[in-house]
Amino acid sequence: MYQGEFGLNMKLGYGKFSWPTGESYHGQFYRDHCHGLGTYMWPDGSSFTGTFYLSHREGYGTMYMKTRLFQGLYKADQRFGPGVETYPDGSQDVGLWFREQLIKLCTQIPSGFSLLRYPEFSSFITHSPARISLSEEEKTEWGLQEGQDPFFYDYKRFLLNDNLTLPPEMYVYSTNSDHLPMTSSFRKELDARIFLNEIPPFVEDGEPWFIINETPLLVKIQKQTYKFRNKPAHTSWNMGAILEGKRSGFAPCGPKEQLSMEMILKAEEGNHEWICRILKDNFASADVADAKGYTVLAAAATHCHNDIVNLLLDCGADVNKCSDEGLTALSMCFLLHYPAQSFKPNVAERTIPEPQEPPKFPVVPILSSSFMDTNLESLYYEVNVPSQGSYELRPPPAPLLLPRVSGSHEGGHFQDTGQCGGSIDHRSSSLKGDSPLVKGSLGHVESGLEDVLGNTDRGSLCSAETKFESNVCVCDFSIELSQAMLERSAQSHSLLKMASPSPCTSSFDKGTMRRMALSMIERRKRWRTIKLLLRRGADPNLCCVPMQVLFLAVKAGDVDGVRLLLEHGARTDICFPPQLSTLTPLHIAAALPGEEGVQIVELLLHAITDVDAKASDEDDTYKPGKLDLLPSSLKLSNEPGPPQAYYSTDTALPEEGGRTALHMACEREDDNKCARDIVRLLLSHGANPNLLWSGHSPLSLSIASGNELVVKELLTQGADPNLPLTKGLGSALCVACDLTYEHQRNMDSKLALIDRLISHGADILKPVMLRQGEKEAVGTAVDYGYFRFFQDRRIARCPFHTLMPAERETFLARKRLLEYMGLQLRQAVFAKESQWDPTWLYLCKRAELIPSHRMKKKGPSLPRGLDVKEQGQIPFFKFCYQCGRSIGVRLLPCPRCYGILTCSKYCKTKAWTEFHKKDCGDLVAIVTQLEQVSRRREEFQ
């Protein structure tokens, strides 16, 4: 029965309606729906007073029950947002609600996972929260354009017209909005009735709201709260404090809140039975989180309690729920599995330490009890435990040792090896799983192992009960642990009650070997947890704070980790933020040292989309030279360089930008073979070897880094050795003779490199632009080499006898290299000129050189009747035929034949001795023969 206002033959306005079941409602109506403020009562005495939306509870309201009172936000008849449930004893359950359960508390768990405890990742945290906006929900966009939509048809446009969505006056036939489409215009009418005489929720007034937690459900809750932010209940009930995680203004915790907090702590402890009982009785939600978004699932996963993880997921926990910092349970496990200490140094991120000089004198390390105080986390990078079961101890670098003092020991073995746990010789050769079991005095493998495992409980490095009946220190023995020994020690330690050392643990429980075994066990357990989360649907692409989990596995060089993530759909088109050069996983993998980098690159290339993706480091400079070079003393006088007939012109300029993965691999100096293998993989997948970064091509980078294997691979795979480089680098031949990179290879290797470049098509006659200040000139690679040579004025200009022995060697090496390049240039000129008519070329040279030279010295003239200018003169390259220079020198022709040019008396004499003595006579004979022919013609005429 209805009593109230009508309109359009429908309930419209204020009224009261009761049902035969005893339920009743009095409040506002709109089009036969309970819509607006009102009170709904049930036969059992419970009632709800608040906002209704199309006959559903939505917005802030108060739910009165027999023994409880709830005040909070609703949506579609369900609790959906901040709320407070009050009990008769005065306690209150405060937090964010979803249906009948708390899903986020206002209390923070002290032991929760937080990125604030990992300052090494602070530079990666560049993510800024998005701003909450409701206007986007009201927009109905067309989507794809007509040309892009493969299923475009004209009737699609009707879907955007509210007048065509429903028949006219549809309310006459039905008002059941649950089964009818909701048009945009009708939704605006409904919202206008709800927010009558109030600021519309779509008007962004006051300070902006930012999304606190990016979990999809919590984003919807935050938007729902933002929509009703101007309601009086939002302020009077202190709902804003709940969103901010502030609980100080409320009564003591109620039962649901207490159980939720305790369940998070029990998940950390691994109390499966207690959590199972709570979830079975529905006392708490499996998806509950503390004030910072630290969920029960995250607590169980980070502590490797896989049984609880399975239980929570079976009970509906969201495996991809994020914390307020943006971390999922999977990303937390990856951050623990790959600490920053496990990351490999690489050239992509510029994390390779600068080489340090070794100590001049041996250092004797001082062993003390502090050696035993290393925490468990530091062992993550000392013990490398791949997921498939192969183990390798990788001790950190240690100081040099003095020669060992030989001595004797009784019985060939120790009576008490309790010190072995704390005195394993980290300074000896690396302890690998495939190494011999024991070297030196420990001959019996099994007995030695039992002694190690058994006697560690009787004595340690600092124990007063240690007995060592030998005059030889344990440090004097080189002990290598095999895979079997590590597995057995780890198995024995797995029986310990404590999974990790605690502050109350005695000193012998902190032994190095024991903690290594515990670390191995914990890593294996966490690896199983990671695999479980991925198998249960964890998204490896969801979390980007501090970085995507694929980056963690790549940076740590874990092949199995990368393979696992790729098998579960990890994206490879991700990158760092612009502040970190937008590096991709392929960039970092190409720079990883060791065989792991090769395998990871191969895995990524099978899933990669753009092998030539560029980093945003186009403004960076490739390691400036260690030499403090002054401006070159070589004078530039706008020399034109070689004529165009001597070289082939470039068809297109190379593309320049940030580093590609190929640049990363070619820049490496750590492992030539692995770098070569990575380059081969990249090229086989279509990497472009002719892109520039910082003026360098991959070929010039490999030359600068001294990797001959990569140079050979690039040239074999079609890299262009004549690619013009920018930023004053010239070409690959110029880089080969640059002083900045001369320390990368010896003299024989430099000469072999030049030969290899020329044999693969490098043109030493290619013009090279040289600039210094406002002056410039065009020369060749030889001129570039001399230009750089004269920048080191100490060696280039000082008298030879005043140089130090090392400087003399440097001077001679540089001169030898430049002379060899001059030889190659001369041979290239001769090879090019051999394609032309030698007589005509010689006449052209004489025609151009004789007039300029006769101003100073009278010489022979051309035969009469041979006017070169009228018949077309061949432009020839003017350079010193001995040293190869064409810039900054004064060139003079041979006074006898005018066939060559030299720059100095030294070059003239040396050229005469080495090659020109014979050629000069031949050229003079040509002139004599031409004169005779010319004379005969004159006599005949």
From Swiss-Prot:
Domain of life, per UniProt, equals: Eukaryota
Zinc finger (MYND-type) boundaries: 880-920
Q: Tell me the PROSITE patterns matching this sequence.
A: ANK_REP_REGION, ANK_REPEAT, ZF_MYND_1, ZF_MYND_2
Which amino acid positions bind Zn(2+) 2, per UniProt?
A: C894, C897, H916, C920
Which keywords belong to this entry?
A: ANK repeat, Metal-binding, Repeat, Zinc, Zinc-finger
Q: Tell me which InterPro entries the record gives.
A: Ankyrin-MYND_domain-protein (IPR053064), Ankyrin_rpt (IPR002110), Ankyrin_rpt-contain_sf (IPR036770), MORN (IPR003409), Znf_MYND (IPR002893)
Q: Where are the MORN repeats?
A: 2-24, 25-47, 70-92
Which residue positions does the secretion signal occupy? Answer: none
Any single GO molecular-function term of the entry would be: zinc ion binding
Pinpoint the residue ranges of every ANK repeat in the record. 292-321, 513-542, 545-574, 581-613, 657-691, 694-723, 737-766
One Pfam family cited in the UniProt record for this chain:
Ank_2
- Give the Gene3D superfamilies listed for this entry: 6.10.140.2220, Ankyrin repeat-containing domain (1.25.40.20), Histone H3 K4-specific methyltransferase SET7/9 N-terminal domain (2.20.110.10)
Q: Which cysteines are joined by disulfide bonds?
A: none
Instruction: Provide the binding site for Zn(2+) 1.
Output: C880, C883, C903, C907
Show the PANTHER family listed in the entry.
ANKYRIN REPEAT AND MYND DOMAIN PROTEIN 1, ANKYRIN REPEAT AND MYND DOMAIN-CONTAINING PROTEIN 1
Q: What is this protein called?
A: Ankyrin repeat and MYND domain-containing protein 1
Q: Which organism encodes this protein?
A: Homo sapiens (Human)
